[in-house]
Amino acid sequence: MTLDKLRGRLLISLVLGALVFVGLSAYADFSDVIDGLGQFRWQYLPAVLGLTSLNYVLRFVKWEYYLRTIGVRGFPRRESALTYFAGLGMVVTPGKVGEWLKCFLLRELHGTPLSRSAPIPVAERLTDSLGLVVLGAVGLIVFGDAWPAFVVVVVGGAFLVLLARHRPLAHWLLVRLERLPLVSRFAKQAEAFYDSSYALLAPVPLGAMTLLSVVSWGFEVLAFYVVLIGLGVDGGADLLLKASFIMPAATLASALLLTPGGLGVAEGGITGLSQVLLGMSKSDAAVGTLIVRFGTLWFGVIVGLVALALVSRLLAGRQPVPVREAAGEGASVS
Protein backbone atom coordinates (compact mmCIF):
# COMPACT_ATOMS: atom_id res chain seq x y z
CA MET A 1 0.00 0.00 0.00
CA THR A 2 1.36 3.44 -0.94
CA LEU A 3 1.85 6.29 1.51
CA ASP A 4 -0.78 8.29 -0.41
CA LYS A 5 -3.37 5.60 0.31
CA LEU A 6 -2.28 5.53 3.95
CA ARG A 7 -2.77 9.29 4.17
CA GLY A 8 -6.24 8.89 2.68
CA ARG A 9 -7.20 6.29 5.26
CA LEU A 10 -5.76 8.42 8.04
CA LEU A 11 -7.86 11.37 6.86
CA ILE A 12 -10.97 9.20 7.07
CA SER A 13 -10.06 8.28 10.65
CA LEU A 14 -9.45 11.91 11.60
CA VAL A 15 -12.95 12.68 10.37
CA LEU A 16 -14.29 9.76 12.42
CA GLY A 17 -12.41 11.07 15.45
CA ALA A 18 -13.99 14.49 14.98
CA LEU A 19 -17.41 12.86 14.71
CA VAL A 20 -16.78 11.00 17.97
CA PHE A 21 -15.95 14.32 19.66
CA VAL A 22 -19.12 15.87 18.26
CA GLY A 23 -21.16 12.85 19.30
CA LEU A 24 -19.86 12.86 22.88
CA SER A 25 -20.35 16.61 23.11
CA ALA A 26 -23.92 16.32 21.86
CA TYR A 27 -24.61 13.49 24.31
CA ALA A 28 -23.27 15.43 27.29
CA ASP A 29 -24.16 18.98 26.11
CA PHE A 30 -21.44 20.85 24.27
CA SER A 31 -21.28 23.81 26.67
CA ASP A 32 -20.92 21.48 29.68
CA VAL A 33 -18.09 19.61 27.94
CA ILE A 34 -16.26 22.87 27.20
CA ASP A 35 -16.71 23.94 30.84
CA GLY A 36 -15.44 20.56 32.02
CA LEU A 37 -12.34 20.82 29.85
CA GLY A 38 -11.69 24.24 31.36
CA GLN A 39 -12.02 22.89 34.90
CA PHE A 40 -9.67 19.94 34.35
CA ARG A 41 -6.35 20.35 36.17
CA TRP A 42 -4.10 20.36 33.12
CA GLN A 43 -0.94 20.07 35.21
CA TYR A 44 -1.78 16.36 35.33
CA LEU A 45 -1.53 15.99 31.55
CA PRO A 46 2.29 15.47 31.48
CA ALA A 47 1.83 12.56 33.90
CA VAL A 48 -0.83 11.08 31.61
CA LEU A 49 1.44 11.36 28.58
CA GLY A 50 4.40 10.02 30.55
CA LEU A 51 2.49 6.92 31.65
CA THR A 52 1.28 6.36 28.10
CA SER A 53 4.86 6.70 26.85
CA LEU A 54 5.95 3.96 29.25
CA ASN A 55 3.29 1.73 27.71
CA TYR A 56 4.67 2.45 24.24
CA VAL A 57 8.24 1.77 25.35
CA LEU A 58 7.33 -1.61 26.84
CA ARG A 59 5.39 -2.53 23.71
CA PHE A 60 8.48 -1.65 21.68
CA VAL A 61 10.43 -4.03 23.93
CA LYS A 62 7.89 -6.70 22.97
CA TRP A 63 8.41 -5.90 19.27
CA GLU A 64 12.17 -6.28 19.70
CA TYR A 65 11.72 -9.57 21.53
CA TYR A 66 9.49 -10.92 18.79
CA LEU A 67 11.99 -9.91 16.10
CA ARG A 68 14.67 -11.93 17.88
CA THR A 69 12.26 -14.83 18.36
CA ILE A 70 11.62 -15.18 14.62
CA GLY A 71 15.32 -14.86 13.86
CA VAL A 72 15.66 -11.26 12.65
CA ARG A 73 19.28 -10.19 13.11
CA GLY A 74 21.26 -7.12 12.13
CA PHE A 75 18.34 -4.67 12.25
CA PRO A 76 19.67 -1.43 13.82
CA ARG A 77 17.86 -0.45 17.02
CA ARG A 78 17.15 3.06 15.75
CA GLU A 79 15.51 1.76 12.57
CA SER A 80 13.59 -0.82 14.57
CA ALA A 81 12.27 1.91 16.87
CA LEU A 82 11.24 4.11 13.94
CA THR A 83 9.54 1.11 12.33
CA TYR A 84 7.60 0.26 15.47
CA PHE A 85 6.54 3.78 16.35
CA ALA A 86 5.57 4.54 12.74
CA GLY A 87 2.90 1.87 13.15
CA LEU A 88 1.32 3.93 15.93
CA GLY A 89 0.56 6.64 13.41
CA MET A 90 -1.79 4.32 11.56
CA VAL A 91 -3.61 2.58 14.43
CA VAL A 92 -6.72 4.62 13.65
CA THR A 93 -6.85 3.70 9.97
CA PRO A 94 -9.68 1.48 8.65
CA GLY A 95 -8.70 -2.13 8.12
CA LYS A 96 -6.11 -2.14 10.93
CA VAL A 97 -3.44 -1.05 8.43
CA GLY A 98 -1.20 0.15 11.24
CA GLU A 99 -0.87 -3.40 12.50
CA TRP A 100 0.82 -4.44 9.26
CA LEU A 101 2.68 -1.24 8.42
CA LYS A 102 5.49 -2.35 10.73
CA CYS A 103 5.92 -5.55 8.74
CA PHE A 104 5.96 -3.64 5.45
CA LEU A 105 8.61 -1.21 6.75
CA LEU A 106 10.63 -4.11 8.16
CA ARG A 107 10.70 -5.61 4.68
CA GLU A 108 11.70 -2.31 3.08
CA LEU A 109 14.45 -1.54 5.60
CA HIS A 110 15.76 -5.01 6.37
CA GLY A 111 14.47 -7.36 3.70
CA THR A 112 12.50 -9.59 6.07
CA PRO A 113 9.64 -11.14 4.06
CA LEU A 114 6.10 -10.36 5.11
CA SER A 115 5.34 -14.06 5.51
CA ARG A 116 7.99 -14.21 8.24
CA SER A 117 6.98 -11.09 10.18
CA ALA A 118 3.18 -11.10 9.71
CA PRO A 119 2.55 -13.30 12.78
CA ILE A 120 4.09 -10.61 15.01
CA PRO A 121 1.01 -8.32 14.99
CA VAL A 122 -1.14 -11.38 15.68
CA ALA A 123 0.98 -12.32 18.70
CA GLU A 124 1.01 -8.68 19.84
CA ARG A 125 -2.77 -8.42 19.77
CA LEU A 126 -3.19 -11.79 21.48
CA THR A 127 -0.84 -11.01 24.36
CA ASP A 128 -2.27 -7.49 24.66
CA SER A 129 -5.77 -8.94 24.95
CA LEU A 130 -4.69 -11.54 27.50
CA GLY A 131 -2.90 -8.83 29.48
CA LEU A 132 -6.08 -6.74 29.50
CA VAL A 133 -8.03 -9.77 30.70
CA VAL A 134 -5.61 -10.19 33.60
CA LEU A 135 -5.85 -6.48 34.45
CA GLY A 136 -9.62 -6.56 34.42
CA ALA A 137 -9.95 -9.91 36.18
CA VAL A 138 -10.32 -8.51 39.70
CA GLY A 139 -12.79 -5.92 38.52
CA LEU A 140 -14.62 -8.61 36.58
CA ILE A 141 -15.33 -10.42 39.84
CA VAL A 142 -16.76 -7.24 41.35
CA PHE A 143 -18.46 -5.89 38.21
CA GLY A 144 -19.34 -9.10 36.42
CA ASP A 145 -21.70 -7.77 33.74
CA ALA A 146 -18.90 -7.54 31.15
CA TRP A 147 -17.75 -11.14 31.47
CA PRO A 148 -18.82 -12.21 27.92
CA ALA A 149 -16.12 -10.04 26.28
CA PHE A 150 -13.48 -11.50 28.57
CA VAL A 151 -14.63 -15.07 27.89
CA VAL A 152 -14.50 -14.50 24.12
CA VAL A 153 -10.90 -13.27 24.38
CA VAL A 154 -9.75 -16.17 26.56
CA VAL A 155 -11.47 -18.86 24.47
CA GLY A 156 -10.39 -17.29 21.18
CA GLY A 157 -6.82 -16.90 22.40
CA ALA A 158 -6.67 -20.50 23.60
CA PHE A 159 -7.98 -21.74 20.24
CA LEU A 160 -5.40 -19.70 18.33
CA VAL A 161 -2.54 -20.97 20.49
CA LEU A 162 -3.65 -24.59 20.24
CA LEU A 163 -4.00 -24.32 16.46
CA ALA A 164 -0.55 -22.77 16.08
CA ARG A 165 1.12 -25.26 18.42
CA HIS A 166 -0.49 -28.40 16.97
CA ARG A 167 2.14 -29.27 14.38
CA PRO A 168 0.40 -32.35 12.85
CA LEU A 169 -2.75 -30.34 12.12
CA ALA A 170 -0.76 -27.39 10.79
CA HIS A 171 1.33 -29.60 8.52
CA TRP A 172 -1.80 -31.36 7.28
CA LEU A 173 -3.29 -27.98 6.34
CA LEU A 174 -0.05 -26.88 4.66
CA VAL A 175 0.09 -30.06 2.57
CA ARG A 176 -3.50 -29.52 1.45
CA LEU A 177 -2.64 -25.92 0.60
CA GLU A 178 0.17 -27.05 -1.69
CA ARG A 179 -2.31 -29.13 -3.68
CA LEU A 180 -4.70 -26.27 -4.41
CA PRO A 181 -3.98 -24.84 -7.87
CA LEU A 182 -4.79 -21.20 -7.11
CA VAL A 183 -2.96 -20.92 -3.79
CA SER A 184 -0.17 -23.48 -4.13
CA ARG A 185 2.29 -20.74 -5.10
CA PHE A 186 1.83 -19.26 -1.62
CA ALA A 187 2.64 -22.53 0.15
CA LYS A 188 6.20 -21.49 0.96
CA GLN A 189 5.01 -18.21 2.47
CA ALA A 190 2.35 -20.06 4.45
CA GLU A 191 4.99 -22.38 5.87
CA ALA A 192 7.14 -19.39 6.87
CA PHE A 193 4.08 -17.78 8.49
CA TYR A 194 3.42 -20.94 10.46
CA ASP A 195 7.04 -21.33 11.57
CA SER A 196 7.00 -17.81 13.01
CA SER A 197 3.61 -18.37 14.64
CA TYR A 198 4.84 -21.59 16.22
CA ALA A 199 7.85 -19.79 17.70
CA LEU A 200 5.97 -16.70 18.88
CA LEU A 201 3.18 -18.66 20.59
CA ALA A 202 5.47 -21.08 22.43
CA PRO A 203 4.83 -21.18 26.20
CA VAL A 204 7.80 -19.00 27.21
CA PRO A 205 7.24 -16.14 24.70
CA LEU A 206 3.48 -16.27 25.24
CA GLY A 207 3.75 -16.15 29.03
CA ALA A 208 6.54 -13.57 29.16
CA MET A 209 4.91 -11.20 26.69
CA THR A 210 1.50 -11.53 28.35
CA LEU A 211 3.12 -10.53 31.64
CA LEU A 212 4.80 -7.61 29.89
CA SER A 213 1.41 -6.61 28.48
CA VAL A 214 -0.08 -6.57 31.97
CA VAL A 215 2.58 -4.08 33.04
CA SER A 216 2.44 -1.97 29.87
CA TRP A 217 -1.34 -1.66 29.79
CA GLY A 218 -1.27 -1.10 33.53
CA PHE A 219 0.40 2.23 32.76
CA GLU A 220 -2.64 3.21 30.66
CA VAL A 221 -4.92 2.28 33.54
CA LEU A 222 -2.82 4.57 35.73
CA ALA A 223 -3.11 7.28 33.06
CA PHE A 224 -6.91 7.01 33.27
CA TYR A 225 -6.67 7.10 37.07
CA VAL A 226 -4.66 10.34 36.86
CA VAL A 227 -7.24 11.84 34.48
CA LEU A 228 -9.98 11.05 36.99
CA ILE A 229 -7.96 12.70 39.76
CA GLY A 230 -7.55 15.73 37.52
CA LEU A 231 -11.33 15.89 37.23
CA GLY A 232 -11.68 16.01 41.00
CA VAL A 233 -12.63 12.37 41.67
CA ASP A 234 -11.38 11.16 45.05
CA GLY A 235 -8.40 8.85 44.62
CA GLY A 236 -7.75 5.58 46.38
CA ALA A 237 -7.80 1.82 45.95
CA ASP A 238 -11.49 1.74 45.03
CA LEU A 239 -11.01 4.22 42.19
CA LEU A 240 -7.94 2.35 40.94
CA LEU A 241 -9.88 -0.93 40.98
CA LYS A 242 -12.70 0.59 38.96
CA ALA A 243 -10.26 2.23 36.53
CA SER A 244 -8.53 -1.12 36.05
CA PHE A 245 -11.86 -2.56 34.97
CA ILE A 246 -13.19 0.31 32.85
CA MET A 247 -10.15 0.70 30.57
CA PRO A 248 -9.61 -3.03 29.82
CA ALA A 249 -13.33 -3.63 29.29
CA ALA A 250 -13.68 -0.71 26.86
CA THR A 251 -10.44 -1.59 25.06
CA LEU A 252 -11.39 -5.25 24.66
CA ALA A 253 -14.85 -4.34 23.38
CA SER A 254 -13.35 -2.04 20.75
CA ALA A 255 -10.84 -4.73 19.74
CA LEU A 256 -13.54 -7.37 19.33
CA LEU A 257 -15.62 -5.05 17.13
CA LEU A 258 -12.55 -4.25 14.97
CA THR A 259 -13.16 -0.51 14.82
CA PRO A 260 -10.10 1.55 13.74
CA GLY A 261 -8.30 2.56 16.92
CA GLY A 262 -11.42 1.57 18.84
CA LEU A 263 -13.07 4.82 17.66
CA GLY A 264 -16.59 5.17 18.98
CA VAL A 265 -16.70 1.88 20.86
CA ALA A 266 -13.93 2.68 23.35
CA GLU A 267 -15.26 6.19 23.93
CA GLY A 268 -18.76 4.88 24.48
CA GLY A 269 -17.52 2.18 26.84
CA ILE A 270 -15.38 4.51 28.95
CA THR A 271 -18.13 7.15 29.14
CA GLY A 272 -20.88 4.69 30.02
CA LEU A 273 -18.88 2.72 32.58
CA SER A 274 -17.63 5.93 34.21
CA GLN A 275 -21.23 6.99 34.76
CA VAL A 276 -22.34 3.60 36.07
CA LEU A 277 -19.36 2.67 38.24
CA LEU A 278 -18.03 6.08 39.25
CA GLY A 279 -21.30 8.00 39.45
CA MET A 280 -19.98 10.71 37.14
CA SER A 281 -22.24 13.11 35.29
CA LYS A 282 -22.56 12.87 31.53
CA SER A 283 -20.32 15.88 30.99
CA ASP A 284 -17.59 14.78 33.42
CA ALA A 285 -17.57 11.25 31.98
CA ALA A 286 -17.35 12.64 28.45
CA VAL A 287 -14.54 15.05 29.39
CA GLY A 288 -12.59 12.26 31.09
CA THR A 289 -13.03 10.07 28.03
CA LEU A 290 -11.85 12.77 25.63
CA ILE A 291 -8.76 13.52 27.70
CA VAL A 292 -7.73 9.91 28.28
CA ARG A 293 -8.28 9.06 24.61
CA PHE A 294 -6.12 12.00 23.60
CA GLY A 295 -3.41 10.78 25.97
CA THR A 296 -3.61 7.09 25.06
CA LEU A 297 -4.61 7.18 21.37
CA TRP A 298 -4.09 10.49 19.60
CA PHE A 299 -0.79 11.21 21.34
CA GLY A 300 0.46 7.91 19.89
CA VAL A 301 -0.84 8.88 16.46
CA ILE A 302 1.16 12.13 16.61
CA VAL A 303 4.32 10.27 17.69
CA GLY A 304 3.72 7.71 14.95
CA LEU A 305 3.32 10.28 12.20
CA VAL A 306 6.63 11.89 13.19
CA ALA A 307 8.30 8.45 13.11
CA LEU A 308 6.69 7.67 9.74
CA ALA A 309 8.03 10.92 8.29
CA LEU A 310 11.53 10.00 9.48
CA VAL A 311 11.23 6.49 8.02
CA SER A 312 10.06 7.93 4.70
CA ARG A 313 13.14 10.16 4.57
CA LEU A 314 15.31 7.18 5.46
CA LEU A 315 13.86 5.07 2.66
CA ALA A 316 14.15 7.90 0.14
CA GLY A 317 17.87 8.18 0.76
CA ARG A 318 18.90 4.55 0.26
CA GLN A 319 18.80 1.78 -2.29
CA PRO A 320 16.00 -0.81 -2.00
CA VAL A 321 16.90 -3.75 0.24
CA PRO A 322 16.40 -7.14 -1.46
CA VAL A 323 13.84 -9.37 0.21
CA ARG A 324 15.43 -12.35 1.92
CA GLU A 325 14.27 -15.88 1.30
CA ALA A 326 11.39 -16.69 3.63
CA ALA A 327 13.02 -19.87 4.81
CA GLY A 328 16.45 -18.38 5.18
CA GLU A 329 15.87 -16.46 8.36
CA GLY A 330 13.64 -18.73 10.27
CA ALA A 331 13.15 -19.03 13.95
CA SER A 332 13.97 -22.14 15.83
CA VAL A 333 10.83 -24.21 16.05
CA SER A 334 12.18 -27.43 17.33
Labelled PLM ranges:
Residues 1-85, 142-254, 277-282, 286-290, ...:
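Predominantly cytoplasmic-facing regulatory/coupling regions of multi-pass membrane proteins
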Residues 86-94, 115-140, 253, 287-303:
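Membrane-embedded alpha-helical segments of transport systems
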